[in-house]
From Swiss-Prot:
Name of the protein in question: RING finger protein 207
Signal peptide annotation: none
InterPro entries documented for this protein: RNF207, Znf_B-box, Znf_C3HC4_RING-type, Znf_RING, Znf_RING/FYVE/PHD, Znf_RING_CS
Predominant location: cytoplasm
Species the sequence originates in: Danio rerio (Zebrafish)
């Protein structure tokens, strides 16, 4: 489309190019006339945007973002903030002419001029005395031109009353009639104009700080991307030099391979540079927007009064928040490394002639950009792994080269075992699967036990097995030692497997993935066991306290079983004595007394020991019945 803004490559990345005038249109390079705001927060004159709509979309001439508009001749919404700033700047420069005598006076010299709000006309000092001296003009509101404010910002457009309150819920000013028409619940969110102005200034300061942080991040990202473009160029030169050096030694057999590798390097270079330039263009287009809005905020604060601020300040805050929340690509999406794997490509062509050296390490050293992006995450992950268990520090050293396993590790192991014959790695996998399943089962059992104890502790506030926590801790320590031993035994086999992997290039990828997954699974099991141990130690004091409370509330639980057995024997002897003395009585009386005795004995045993009164009553009944039984044979 004609009329786009094309920056040169050098100016596009220049940080000073963002310091443009906030009231000048990017297209016509003139002061804004009817400024329109696009969805990307770039602003242009309405006349500059006419004729650019295609399929109800308007493409931004600066960043290329498409804004949706309705109709062919439709335009984006008017930017009230910029229009206010443009009008404010124009008011300070234009001259004012008296409506009666045509006396011209600049607005800087406002002391000699007045303004009649009733007539909506400016008047000089002499005309004010001569024309408005009559009685019919006595009710006209005449104010100094310096103190005149726009009624649109000071009075309610619906009721023509002055604003007196501000609603923090609706973000709008209220006159006395608006306040009366509000619901009672909404009146609690109303504050006076002065308080609302102070709070609004504080919120705007916070929004400005967020935009400034985004501006600093964007500048740092531009510097980083410029450095990465230089790295890409340097790396592609280095890669091409290495390719050409190796090609010169094998010129006869690698002519075709040279063309392919150079093309691959160039393709990577073009792709990466194109990606970086696209991201750089996006950030370069973002800086003018940030600068314009920062200057806009400063100008708005300096030129707007309280009413104007409260009328449009929250729109500015909302816009700043939306700008900060837009998806800005501040980090490089790729590394600057150019890697064509030329050694492996040459080795494939000259495999009978070349001695295969050590393969390239899977974990290559990252560039400056990736180091800046991932340094904090790597430090946090390493610290979190080391703080769980002392033994984890040794295993975390090896975890740097451990790749994240795929979700199909177990399936890949089965497929690999089904494909090949008897190899050392196959034998290792068989042994490992058995050991791993055993350890996993032990960990799952411990997890179930801890979950059961935790559930009893939180829901029922009681424990069925107070000594189970110590058993879990002991078992956890044993499992931890088993995992460490298994991990060490698996780690010792790395050197042997690396030699085998060098010889079997076709199967090495699957085997390495499964092997590293095994180490990762062991690390995960060890981490779960560490979490389990920590939780068990935290629950231990609560279990001991509950056990002590239970012992205090139920003292009969502390009585040994031998006492209970002696009490049972005594009761049996008493029962036999009562039976022998009652042989002379009729059978019906004997059966009745026996049933009463059995009932009373059972009631005395089943009575809750906590109820002392009930226990004392039963005891008295038992003594009475025993005396009655003794008196029967008499």
């Amino acid at each position: 489309m004609s009329g786009e803004i094309f920056y040169s490559v050098d100016n596009l990345y220049d940080l000073d190019s963002a310091n443009c005038h906030p009231l000048v249109c990017h297209l016509c390079q003139e002061q804004y006339e009817h400024p329109c705001l696009l969805d990307c927060y770039h602003t242009f004159c309405a006349s500059c945007l006419r004729g650019r709509v295609a399929d109800s979309r308007l493409t931004c001439p600066v960043c290329g973002h498409q804004s949706v508009v309705k109709g062919i001749n439709a335009l984006p919404p008017e930017d009230r903030l910029l229009k206010f700033l443009v009008d404010s700047s124009a008011d300070s420069e234009e001259t004012v002419q008296c409506a009666n005598c045509d006396l011209e006076c600049k607005k800087q010299d406002v002391d000699a001029m007045y303004y009649c709000n009733t007539c909506c006309q400016p008047l000089c000092r002499d005309c004010r005395e001569t024309t408005h001296k009559a009685k019919m003009f006595s009710r006209h509101e005449i104010v100094s031109l310096a103190k005149r404010t726009k009624e649109a910002h000071k009075k309610c457009a619906l009721h023509e009353e002055f604003y007196i309150m501000f609603s923090t819920e609706k973000k709008s000013m209220l006159c006395i009639n608006c306040f009366r028409d509000m619901q009672v619940e909404s009146r609690a969110h109303c504050i006076d104009i002065e308080t609302a102005y102070i709070q609004g200034c504080e919120k705007l300061d916070q929004a400005v700080l967020a935009v400034k942080e985004l501006q600093m991040s964007a500048r740092e990202a531009i510097i980083l991307l410029k450095a990465m473009i230089g790295e890409v160029r340097a790396n592609v030169d280095e890669e091409e030099s290495a390719i050409c050096t190796l090609f010169s030694n094998m010129q006869e057999k690698l002519a075709e391979r040279k063309k392919i590798l150079l093309k691959a390097a160039r393709s990577q270079h073009e792709e990466k540079e194109r990606t970086f330039k696209e991201q750089l263009s996006h950030l370069a287009a973002l800086l003018p927007t940030l600068q314009v809005h920062l200057v806009t905020c400063s100008a708005f604060l300096s030129s707007a009064n309280k009413f104007e601020f409260l009328d449009m300040g929250y729109q500015l805050m909302e816009r700043l928040k939306k700008i900060v929340k837009l998806p800005h690509r501040l980090r490089p999406t790729q590394s600057s490394k150019i890697n064509t794997e030329y050694r492996s490509e040459f080795a494939r062509c000259l495999e009978p002639l070349l001695l295969l050296g050590q393969r390239r390490s899977m974990s290559t050293t990252g560039s400056v950009a990736l180091a800046l992006g991932n340094a904090s995450g790597l430090m946090q992950s390493s610290l979190s792994v080391q703080c769980h268990s002392p033994a984890m520090s040794d295993m975390s050293l090896c975890s740097s080269v451990v790749r994240r396993p795929t979700s199909h590790r177990y399936i890949s192991t089965k497929v690999l075992l089904a494909k090949g014959g008897e190899t050392p790695f196959m034998e290792h996998c068989c042994n490992y699967e058995n050991s791993y399943r055993t350890l996993q089962t032990e960990i799952q059992k411990l997890k179930d036990q801890v979950q059961e104890i935790h559930r009893d502790l939180t829901k029922h506030h009681s424990l069925t097995k107070p000594d189970s926590m110590s058993e879990i801790l002991e078992k956890s320590v044993q499992v931890d030692s088993q995992i460490s031993s298994e991990y060490a035994s698996v780690e010792l086999m790395r050197a042997m497997f690396e030699e085998i992997w060098e010889e079997t290039l076709q199967r090495v990828a699957n085997e390495q993935e499964i092997y590293e997954a095994q180490l990762h699974d062991l690390l995960q099991l060890k981490q779960e066991n560490s979490y389990l141990t920590t939780i068990s130690r935290q629950i231990g004091p609560y279990i001991r306290s509950i056990a002590k409370v239970k012992e205090r509330l139920e003292p009969r639980l502390k009585e040994p079983k031998e006492l209970k057995d002696d009490r049972t024997e005594i009761m049996l002897k008493l029962y036999e004595d009562s039976t022998s003395t009652a042989d002379t009585q009729p059978s019906n009386e004997l059966s009745c007394n026996t049933e009463d005795n059995w009932t009373l004995n059972s009631l005395s045993e089943e009575t809750n020991p906590k109820n002392k009164d009930y226990y004392r009553t039963n005891k008295q009944k038992n003594t009475t019945d025993s005396t009655n039984r003794k008196e029967i044979p008499m």
